[in-house]
Amino acid sequence: MNTVRSEKDSMGAIDVPADKLWGAQTQRSLEHFRISTEKMPTSLIHALALTKRAAAKVNEDLGLLSEEKASAIRQAADEVLAGQHDDEFPLAIWQTGSGTQSNMNMNEVLANRASELLGGVRGMERKVHPNDDVNKSQSSNDVFPTAMHVAALLALRKQLIPQLKTLTQTLSEKSRAFADIVKIGRTHLQDATPLTLGQEISGWVAMLEHNLKHIEYSLPHVAELALGGTAVGTGLNTHPEYARRVADELAVITCAPFVTAPNKFEALATCDALVQAHGALKGLAASLMKIANDVRWLASGPRCGIGEISIPENEPGSSIMPGKVNPTQCEALTMLCCQVMGNDVAINMGGASGNFELNVFRPMVIHNFLQSVRLLADGMESFNKHCAVGIEPNRERINQLLNESLMLVTALNTHIGYDKAAEIAKKAHKEGLTLKAAALALGYLSEAEFDRWVRPEQMVGSMKAGG
């Protein structure tokens, strides 16, 4: 039994594994780009299949493709979407910057499979042509950016945004639950005036709410599709109604608000929509890193750290120190946030480096974009499930640190003035006294006045957690 078959393209014949659906151009890419291990993301492959499915339907409706061929292409695309042919898409991210080889990989797989569905023999009877039929009314230059936007929008809507909302809700519930717990604040890593634990956490909630708004603001641009621009944005070799119809078809089959890009030249020449959207993801990463750092500092200890909150003990933390438990969810979250920030640099460089009518950094851009979405979505889910939901206050420790703080002296500013209040704090710190003892020793106020004016619960202001 032959292990290879001969396939040909405009450059001639080449041997292809007999059991594979791909053709000559895919095989050439496999042989010429043996670079690292990163493959085209499955979600991008499925977005390409969605794009080809929609194009086949519209080409049929416009009388440009026979019902027989269009139906076979759609059936083959549905098989790809069902995951039946995932191993037919082996190409590396590091290939042509337009994604042409992955577009042809999809064209060849769908053409060969559609030909089989119509009774043809793989690689011998080409009843459906990869370029003339599967790629009809298309160019890699508009297909690949379209698939990028489809994959990106679906990932943001289905993966990232739900997890962001869940984590925000968890922290909002914690903020309300801890609204009455007065604790010492900290600025510059030094003691500051009091606030409630609920107020502190409400800041985290507001950060995430703003992140959600920033991400949602970026979605309409990502929903604009390049399909119909063909080679350079002019729409050469397309029907006048094709671009609008194919965007409408993709919107229907994905239940997402896709529209045809109003300017195809921008859609082909730039990655601006994904640059902007990933900027919002970088902002989310910055917020999550701050939150995770706050959590692990507040939970530090258990006896020699801040220790104002407890977090779940999920696994042993040391191979040498018995009983040690570490804030591992915080560490995982901060690491992936660093990766997202690195991805942002790569995406910015790729987005800035397009020339004339086409950006040729697209595979790298979408690889990093989808990785960031996956990291943030998975990271938030894990952090929420294994850490955030289990945050609990250590009231005794909170009260101890609150009562030991010298910054409670700030409450005296309006009664005896800043200079005298500062003198009290310095004396207490230098001589190891309580604030009250230092104040009475200096004779600036009576014990009754001190007790009446220095009350932490009255120093947290009227700003409620959440607004």
From Swiss-Prot:
Its main location: cytoplasm. The active site is at residues 188, 318. It catalyses: (S)-malate = fumarate + H2O. It holds the Pfam family FumaraseC_C. Substrate binds at residues 98-100, 126, 129-132, 139-141, 187, 319, 324-326. Signal peptide: none annotated. Disulfide bonds: none annotated. It is an enzyme of class 4 (lyase). GO terms for biological process: fumarate metabolic process; malate metabolic process; tricarboxylic acid cycle. GO terms for cellular component: cytoplasm. InterPro entries: Fum_hydII (IPR005677), Fumarase/histidase_N (IPR024083), Fumarase_C_C (IPR018951), Fumarate_lyase_CS (IPR020557), Fumarate_lyase_fam (IPR000362), Fumarate_lyase_N (IPR022761), L-Aspartase-like (IPR008948). Its EC number is 4.2.1.2. Pathway: Carbohydrate metabolism; tricarboxylic acid cycle; (S)-malate from fumarate: step 1/1. One of its GO terms (molecular function) is fumarate hydratase activity. It is found in: Cytoplasm. The record marks 331 as: Important for catalytic activity. Coiled coil: none annotated. Keywords: Cytoplasm, Lyase, Tricarboxylic acid cycle. Belongs to the class-II fumarase/aspartase family. Fumarase subfamily. Involved in the TCA cycle. Catalyzes the stereospecific interconversion of fumarate to L-malate. Homotetramer. There are 2 substrate-binding sites: the catalytic A site, and the non-catalytic B site that may play a role in the transfer of substrate or product between the active site and the solvent. Alternatively, the B site may bind allosteric effectors. This is Fumarate hydratase class II. The lineage of its organism: Bacteria, Pseudomonadati, Pseudomonadota, Gammaproteobacteria, Enterobacterales.
